[in-house]
């Protein structure tokens, strides 16, 4: 990528009294850049190029070419806040308005049949995205009791989003004009006494689709905004020797934007709306000082991440890859993609005089690449450990020399952390194409730090 930005900020703060202050920020960012790639055997119609007639009079529908895809954008706005800090009450209110204006366009820089280009640096698509994003909020935290406080946070957010022009997919026209109005409240109570702490909270959060949701949408797909209702409660206890904690959560979604397992042409992970889904689980944390020179800490997350009544949409082609129709399979309750049921971490830290060491391990359960809960489209569970050792020398001619050696993937686990998949029905058979992002085996890194 060849991309540059210029960022400008103007910030003003005013202290009105011991209790009140105000802040105002104006900002502007301009960016422009591109990436360039070679496409072998590209269809000329995908680049709005006329068919090439060779010397024998044959029509050539494909050519090798170099394309350059550009982004030129402006982002600017204003952010304001007023803050009150009293003995029992802390209060903030504010507003913001921001606008993003971005041009996406592509040029054919070179083609094997150069006389096929209507003009140098031929532009084959251009579209403009414009996003106006404004919000107002107020939040308060009140000390109800020396050991008890409550908080309330309310936000209104409005969005106007448009995309207009031709897309890079065979010049398809894109026309998006969407308005959203969101109300995002959050409330909770916190309790603290001695080494004990507990909380309960409820919040609502809304999220709009992004550009890819519109430009990469499937046939008859109409991206919607996501709404989350989040319920959480937790308890913890700690002292100078150990600490434990447990958090319970239930996240109820409407139209959740969920990873599909598919990727775009440039490798971006794609999402799509799922009407009814949830995530629920428990997060456990703990730690203990085993000795003055040794301590352990760890965490464990156990969860269920489910789609209710998932309907798989699958494209159907004939033997020559001509599109026939789109079928739908009702799969019932399935697992959400890339959402393992178990994640566990453990870390031992050792320190003795000038020597230190740490040993950490992580286990991640099975992750499904798409939302069908099909095992042959999944990432296997993996367990990985890393070891770090260090020693600090204190010579007379300088403050210190610190030497660290880290061995990653100590036991040479063969594993992947991400993947993509494309599946279709071709000539009556299930077709699958996938790719896995494999991770490095055992590897080491050494570092020397000098302090004067």
Regions found by a protein language model. Give the residues of each.
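Membrane-embedded beta-barrel scaffold of Gram-negative outer-membrane proteins
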Residues: 19-27, 190-203, 207, 224-280, ...
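Conserved C-terminal beta-signal and adjacent last beta-strands/turns
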Residues: 140-141, 231, 286, 301-302, ...
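Outer-membrane beta-barrel channels and translocator barrels
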Residues: 17-19, 86-89, 145-149, 157, ...
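Hydrophobic, lipid-facing positions within transmembrane beta-strands of outer-membrane proteins
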Residues: 6-10, 74-80, 132-138, 183-187, ...
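Gram-negative outer-membrane beta-barrel transporters
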Residues: 146, 250-252, 272-371
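Face-selective signature of the C-terminal outer-membrane beta-barrel domain
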Residues: 3-35, 39-168, 190-194, 198-201, ...
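Flexible, surface-exposed loop regions and adjacent strand-edge segments
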Residues: 1, 38-49, 104-117, 166-175, ...
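Transmembrane beta-strands of outer-membrane beta-barrel pores
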Residues: 28-32, 86, 97-101, 156-160, ...
């Amino acid at each position: 990528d060849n991309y540059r930005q210029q960022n400008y900020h103007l910030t003003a703060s005013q202290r009105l009294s011991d209790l009140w202050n105000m802040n105002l920020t104006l900002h502007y960012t301009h960016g422009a850049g591109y990436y360039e790639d070679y496409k072998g055997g590209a269809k000329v119609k995908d680049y709005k190029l006329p068919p090439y007639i060779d010397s024998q009079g044959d029509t050539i529908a494909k050519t090798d070419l170099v394309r350059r895809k550009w982004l030129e954008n402006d982002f600017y706005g204003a952010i304001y806040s007023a803050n009150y800090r009293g003995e029992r009450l802390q209060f903030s209110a504010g507003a913001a308005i921001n606008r993003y204006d971005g041009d996406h366009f592509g040029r054919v820089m070179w083609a094997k049949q150069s006389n096929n280009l209507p003009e140098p640096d031929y532009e084959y698509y251009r579209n403009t995205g414009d996003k106006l994003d404004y919000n107002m909020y107020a939040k308060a935290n009140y000390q109800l009791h020396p050991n008890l406080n409550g908080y309330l946070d309310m936000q209104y957010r409005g969005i106007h989003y448009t995309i207009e022009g031709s897309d890079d997919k065979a010049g398809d026209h894109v026309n998006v004009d969407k308005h959203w109005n969101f109300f995002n409240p959050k409330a909770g109570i916190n309790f603290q006494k001695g080494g004990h702490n507990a909380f309960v909270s409820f919040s609502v959060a809304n999220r709009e689709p992004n550009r890819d949701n519109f430009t990469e949408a499937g046939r008859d797909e109409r991206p919607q905004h996501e709404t989350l209702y989040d319920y959480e409660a937790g308890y913890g206890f700690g002292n100078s020797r150990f600490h434990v904690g447990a958090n319970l959560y239930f996240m109820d979604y409407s139209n959740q934007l969920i990873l599909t397992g598919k990727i775009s042409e440039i490798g971006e992970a794609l999402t799509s709306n799922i009407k009814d889904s949830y995530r629920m689980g428990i997060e456990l944390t703990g730690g203990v000082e085993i000795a003055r020179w040794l301590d352990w800490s760890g965490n464990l997350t156990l969860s269920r991440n489910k789609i209710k009544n998932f309907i798989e949409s699958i494209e159907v082609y004939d033997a020559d890859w001509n599109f026939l129709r789109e079928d739908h399979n009702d799969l019932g309750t399935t697992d959400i993609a890339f959402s393992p049921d178990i994640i566990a971490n453990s870390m031992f830290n050792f320190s003795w005089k000038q020597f230190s060491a740490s040993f950490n391990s992580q286990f991640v359960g099975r992750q499904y690449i798409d939302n069908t809960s099909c095992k042959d489209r999944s990432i296997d569970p993996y367990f990985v450990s890393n070891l770090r050792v260090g020693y600090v020398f204190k010579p007379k001619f300088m403050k210190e020399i610190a030497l660290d050696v880290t061995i990653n993937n100590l036991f040479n686990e063969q594993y992947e952390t991400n993947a993509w998949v494309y599946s279709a029905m071709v000539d009556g058979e299930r077709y699958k194409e996938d790719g896995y992002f494999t991770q490095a085996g055992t590897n080491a890194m050494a570092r020397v730090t000098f302090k004067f």
